[in-house]
């Protein structure tokens, strides 16, 4: 196989991408990971991860992603900290171009694991206090707000769900929405309204997030009167949706209206030989552990597909690796 041709090329370096790489490399598939310039994905912005199995004392998001990368690299996965700027999935081998090189990389199969990002308001305080009280995931971080007061911005089902999750821990949740009416479904809205810990502040926009080293409050403005006030809160949660990082694959694979990659069969996309894993195709869970599981499944699907095409004859099943192979890999 030429130096520029791989059995599997994985685009993305979060839990899904690194897990896919681990399984691919351990199956003796020639594997390349385009990590992108944001190595590790959204977990690089997470201070404490306490809901991933195996880290009983919790772990910093960046440290966790370092572990993922090292484990995949240990078995021979090649890493490149480059963004993919163009792909051609119209014929095989597939071709992918990075921003660093004019010549393409060739792939017998591709796993899309580019993830999705929470939408933000674009406030200076959001980026400055990211992971220091600013979050886009209540399921991930609600535990840290026991007995505290938090603000949630949004008006759809996501906002109602985030507020409800936070209310299990926080003493008070203020749900802020710029309109008087909500896009949320009736049942989700009623559930939030009936929760005594959740208060609603409508017709209001957030002007700034306050605090030096951690969130201390938010400055809000009434859209009707222009009157401003400061709310003292310990945390701020954006719940205005997510944006999948799929623009480079636009027109290459089928996506839904939100830009999420459509999985036609298991993890395979509309293009045979191209698979999707993690938040890039997950509109519901968006958890590190589910993304990692997706990465595992995508590689298993890719390996089986390659075998069906007669292109993975030399690949070994991870389940039948010999002790000698394990010892060799441990010394890498």
Model-predicted regions and their roles:
Residues 14-15, 38, 116-118, 157-158, ...:
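Residue-level detector of alpha-helix initiation sites
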Residues 5, 122, 128-144, 239-287, ...:
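FAD-site-proximal beta/loop scaffold in flavoenzymes
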Residues 102-200, 209-211:
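Predominantly flavin-linked oxidoreductase catalytic cores and closely associated redox partners
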Residues 72-99, 105-107, 167-264, 304-332:
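A Rossmann-like FAD-binding core segment of flavoenzymes
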Residues 160-162, 271, 280-328:
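A conserved FAD-binding loop/helix module that cradles the flavin
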Residues 6-75, 148, 160-186, 201, ...:
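Beta1-alpha1 glycine-rich phosphate/pyrophosphate-binding loop at the start
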